[in-house]
From Swiss-Prot:
Transmembrane region(s): none
Additional remark text: Substitutes for REP-1 thereby preventing widespread tissue abnormalities in patients with choroideremia who lack REP-1.
Statement: the UniProt record of this protein carries the keyword Membrane: no
GO biological process assignments: intracellular protein transport; protein geranylgeranylation; small GTPase-mediated signal transduction; vesicle-mediated transport
Organism of this sequence: Homo sapiens (Human)
Protein name from the UniProt record: Rab proteins geranylgeranyltransferase component A 2
InterPro entries xref list: FAD/NAD-bd_sf, GDP_dissociation_inhibitor, Rab_escort, RAE1_2_domI_C
Gene it is expressed from: CHML
Residues carrying Phosphoserine: S649
Keyword Ribonucleoprotein part of the UniProt annotation: no
Chain spans, region Disordered: 188-209, 609-656
Domain of life: Eukaryota
Quaternary structure, from the entry: Monomer. Heterotrimer composed of RABGGTA, RABGGTB and CHML; within this trimer, RABGGTA and RABGGTB form the catalytic component B, while CHML (component A) mediates Rab protein binding. Interacts with RAB1A, RAB7A and RAB27A, but has much lower affinity for RAB1A, RAB7A and RAB27A than CHM. Interacts with the non-phosphorylated forms of RAB3A, RAB3B, RAB3C, RAB3D, RAB5B, RAB5C, RAB8A, RAB8B, RAB10, RAB12, RAB35, and RAB43.
Function according to Swiss-Prot or TrEMBL: Substrate-binding subunit (component A) of the Rab geranylgeranyltransferase (GGTase) complex. Binds unprenylated Rab proteins and presents the substrate peptide to the catalytic component B. The component A is thought to be regenerated by transferring its prenylated Rab back to the donor membrane. Less effective than CHM in supporting prenylation of Rab3 family.
Comp. bias intervals (Basic and acidic residues): 639-656
């Protein structure tokens, strides 16, 4: 059982999100004894990626409001000494709210997949549905977990040779199948056809149109191909010159992750989706811009690259919004829209001139490193990145435990410092420093914290929002707010070659800051860009839209920007990591991890390059024995010998 865990560590980290995983790798790399645990059965927390059935199991868990860990059978209060006090941790994960799922794909009763608990029909996307009780779906039982098992951390899906690059960027189509599982039960609400002939009538209409005939995709197909889906809980991209890419290369964690270029930046203007020119070549090849606009845009972008050298050009407008400043530059409305929403990707009302110029400069500086856009996307989803850092931690001696609940922090009354944690087995584990993800802190500790919310939608569609001759396109689109003061909606569309969805489908993520529930915030944008699969009447306009097969809406807590002083009674050696923020990049998570690491270990280098294998001195085999007779503790401690043999200089094989 858990008695096999050592009782003394330098650092105990609770939660396996991106900031915690980066910290785990940094601490382990600097020689600290690290215990990294999570109450959940999967790695990544709210940064995780799931297969389709795994996402349904995750959805069911939150709809039933289950505990984030198993109930303890130990009375932990008896383990607290007279000179100590306990700070309890939260029993339930309350970071996800307002989950609503809808299935628009047709139901094929001849397939060997049955679904229980269908929702009422919602043909217009705008009618409020009564949420029915969540029941189990009869899916084939899944017998494996894609996350770390009891003996090893998650290996890369294809073995890398010594000559492969450290940061691998690929444009090839799907060539590797990745399997991810999370339980064997699903929850689904469906929108089924009243009429068995609807799909045939749709096909008839489409046959007569000039558009190519689309494949008929059923819910059964989605379920059967569920392993091909890797659905992110949080939608983000990596700036090619951003902090996370630099950290991945420097630390050599990039050896565990592969990337694909984001191929298009799109704009939504006057009800139409169009491609935004980014590079100089794109600008002058664009058919959307006049020759005068092309020259104006190039002149302005050149200025943005070196705006700090020309303060007289913007000093008088420092207090103005960026949108107002763009008007003073005499850019056409078309160019203003492109710069504001598709290049700077900033808010029309709240972004200042300086912030807008800086965002534009950052966008331009990231162009050309790996492709024609500034962005990269990790193959198999965002969840690969925290797992990569966890693997690096394990390579240097970190111990990992999943489904391992922590009851409380043990605090010394005299010094006010945390001495230990008590887990759900009743084991007391001592450490010098403790790092915890915000969602684990109790309501009492967080009573003064004011959280923001993120509105999220995940869609499965049958074609791209902007069709071209190339079907394997990865795109990002910013949809401006319909009303002044509202938030823009960020849309990321992923094709099957990103290894996140099955063939002939697209996975679409929508994200914005919450003002209402996720469905209320995002449904209007969904209606603009997509048409439900179950609509009976399809006019010419709707034929150009992708058909919506499946949709999930949910709100996620945004704990970024919370100061340490907002938490009540936090011991000085307990450090808090936030969950995902609403931003497009991962800069906040990297900055937070580095800041906390420097606070804890001010003299240590943050995630230094790995050592030369010839310089590693082994102290003997210190592999931890596997816990006998237990299935609810997953432990992994990798010996560094095999891994270190293949470590190389991060820049050695980098391709631009």
């Amino acid at each position: 059982m858990a008695d096999n865990l050592p009782t003394e560590f330098d650092v105990v980290i609770i939660g396996t999100g991106l900031p915690e995983s980066i910290l785990a790798a940094a601490c382990s790399r600097s020689g600290q004894r690290v215990l990294h645990i999570d109450s959940r059965s999967y790695y990544g927390g709210n940064w995780a990626s799931f297969s389709f059935s795994g996402l349904l199991s995750w959805l069911k868990e939150y709809q039933q409001n289950n505990d984030i860990g198993e109930e303890s059978t130990v009375v932990w209060q008896d383990l607290i000494h007279e000179t100590e006090e306990a700070i309890t941790l939260r029993k339930k994960d309350e970071t996800i709210q307002h989950t609503e799922a809808f299935c628009y794909a047709s139901q094929d009763m001849e397939d060997n997949v049955e679904e229980i608990g269908a929702l009422q029909k919602n043909p217009s996307l705008g009618v409020s549905n009564t949420f029915t009780e969540v029941l189990d779906s009869a899916l084939p039982e899944e017998s494996q977990l894609s996350y770390f098992n009891s003996d090893e951390m998650p290996a890369k899906h294809t073995q890398k040779s010594d000559t492969e690059i450290s940061l691998e960027v690929t444009d090839v189509e799907e060539s590797v199948e990745k399997e991810k599982y999370c339980g064997d039960k699903t929850c689904m609400h469906t929108v089924s056809d009243k009429d068995g002939d609807k799909d045939e009538s749709k096909s008839t209409v489409e046959d007569k149109a000039d558009e190519p005939i689309r494949n008929r995709i059923t819910y059964s197909q989605i379920v059967k191909e569920g392993r091909r889906f890797n659905i992110d809980l949080v939608s983000k991209l990596l700036y090619s010159q951003g902090l996370l890419i630099d950290l991945l290369i420097k630390s050599d964690v990039s050896r565990y992750v592969e990337f694909k270029n984001v191929t298009r930046i799109l704009a939504f203007r006057e009800g139409k989706v169009e491609q935004v020119p980014c590079s100089r070549a794109d600008v002058f090849n664009s058919k959307e811009l006049t020759m005068v606009e092309k020259r104006m845009l190039m002149k302005f972008l050149t200025f943005c690259l070196e705006y700090e050298q020309h303060p007289d050009e913007y000093q008088a407008f420092r207090q103005c919004s960026f949108s107002e400043y763009l008007k003073t530059k005499k850019l056409t409305p078309n160019l203003q829209h492109f710069v504001l929403h598709s290049i700077a990707m900033t808010s029309e009302s709240s972004c200042t001139t300086i912030d807008g110029l800086n965002a534009t400069k950052n966008f331009l500086q990231c162009l050309g490193r790996f492709g024609n856009t500034p962005f990269l996307f990790p193959l198999y989803g965002q969840g690969e990145i925290p797992q990569g850092f966890c693997r690096m931690c394990a390579v240097f001696g970190g111990i990992y435990c999943l489904r391992h609940k922590v009851q409380c922090f043990v605090v010394d009354k005299e010094s006010g410092r945390c001495k230990a944690i008590i887990d759900h087995f009743g084991q007391r584990i001592n450490a010098k420093y403790f790092i915890v993800e915000d969602s684990y802190l109790s309501e009492e500790t967080c009573s003064n914290v004011q959280y923001k919310q993120i509105s999220r939608a995940v869609l499965i569609t049958d074609q791209s929002i902007l069709k071209t001759d190339l079907d394997q396109q990865t795109s990002i689109l910013i949809v401006p707010p319909a009303e002044p003061g509202a938030c823009a909606v960020r849309v990321t569309e992923l094709c099957s070659s990103t290894m996140t969805c099955m063939k002939d489908t697209y996975l679409v993520h929508l994200t914005c800051s919450s003002s209402k529930t996720a469905r209320e915030d995002l449904e209007s944008v969904v209606k603009k860009l997509f048409t439900p699969y179950t609509e009976t009447e399809i006019n010419e306009e709707e034929l150009t839209k992708p058909r919506l097969l499946w949709a999930l809406y949910f709100n996620m807590r945004d704990s970024s920007g919370i100061s340490r002083s907002s938490y009540n009674g936090l011991p000085s050696n307990v450090y808090v990591c936030s969950g995902p923020d609403c931003g497009l990049g991962n800069e906040h998570a990297v900055k937070q991890a580095e800041t906390l690491f420097q606070e804890i270990f001010p003299t240590e280098e943050f995630c230094p390059p790995p050592p030369n294998p010839e310089d590693i001195i082994f102290d003997g085999d210190d592999k931890q024995p596997e816990a006998p007779g237990t299935n609810n503790v997953v432990m992994a401690k990798l010996e560094s010998s095999e891994e270190s043999k293949n470590l190389e200089s991060p820049e050695k094989h980098l391709q631009n």
